[in-house]
Structures are given as C-alpha cells and as structure tokens.
Amino acid sequence: VDIDNLSDWAKYEALVYSGLEIVSPGKKRRPIPEKIDLILSDFDGVITDNRVWVNQDGTETIAAFRSDSVRVRELRKVGIDVIILSSEVNRVVEARAKKMGVEAIHGVALHEKGQVMQEILRQKNIKAENVVFIGNDINDLPCFEIAGWSVAVADAYPEVIHAADFVLTKPGGHGALRELCDLILKKSR
C-alpha cells in the first residue's frame, strides 16, 4: 500500500474494512475447515475490549458486544458448539456465558490453556481439525497451534496476528465474535 495523500488513505482504509484479508507473508495459512464442530473463544480481548472498570470496593465491570449472542445462538442451531476458554477468574465470564447460552471454562492458568483445550476435545470426542479458536493475546498461541483454524481479532497482539490463519476486521469487544459467526454461517449455507 502506497499512501501519498489523504484520498489514498480513505481508499485503502475502505479496502481494509471491506474485508481485505490481513496476513503475514511468512505464515502459511490454513483454509477454513470444511466441517466445524466447535468454536473456542477467549474472553478478555475477544468478547470484551480487554478493558476493565474497577470501583472503589474492587468490583470489576466489563463491557461486551450484545450482538455476538445473536449469532452464537444461530451457530448452535446449525450444530456448531461454542465454548469460552479463559484465564480470567472473575465470575463475569460465567455470567456472560450464561447470557450467551454457552459453556465457560475459566480461571485456566495462562500456561495451561493449550492442555485444557486438548482435554475439552478429548472429552467431547472432537477432532482438532474441526475446531476454530479465536483469540487476541500470546497466551492463546498454544490453542492456535492445536485448532484447525486460528482467528485473531483486529487489535490482537502482533505475535497473534502473525500466527493466525485469519484476521478479523473487528476489534475485540466490538463485534469480532459476531464477525466470525457471520463468516462461518455464510460458509455453511
């Protein structure tokens, strides 16, 4: 991309937001799986925008994108399960998962996320190649290696974007999960 003036900027920004795939030239990307049985999603930085508000008594509050829930329910109707897999220990993860109608496994040690993912797949008898993982931070990288397709939110850390098979146009907490759901639902039609 060569930006010489403001009109170039607007043109290329429109191109990116219209669905241009952002990739790392050194990474061999895998295609979206033909069959998807499960989407595993990180919580902070995917369902939320990675920010937290703390009041004077230490209670934490987050914000989530409500429209994610609508598309998650549609995925479940076509037989694709969704599970939140998070290192976050706060009960807000369970509360949001319940509202979304999905299972949440949270409080997972940062260095054990990949192991926990493998255990989920074993218990549910799901092949890794039929799993999509969406994340944003370096503790998600072991899950990226296991999943059949790894997806990064637009504002993920550079190492995560480099490792991803696909990078969304939406940032975490602002419709990233819905964008992924839309992409998968469109493919399954």
Language-model features and meaning:
Residues 10-13, 73-76, 118, 178-182:
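Predominant activation on well-ordered alpha-helical scaffold segments within soluble catalytic domains
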Residues 4, 42, 135-136:
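Acidic di-acidic motifs
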Residues 2-6, 66, 163:
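Alpha-helical architecture
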Residues 58-65, 92, 98-100, 104-107, ...:
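Mg2+-dependent phosphoryl-transfer enzymes with acidic/Ser/Thr/Gly-rich catalytic loops
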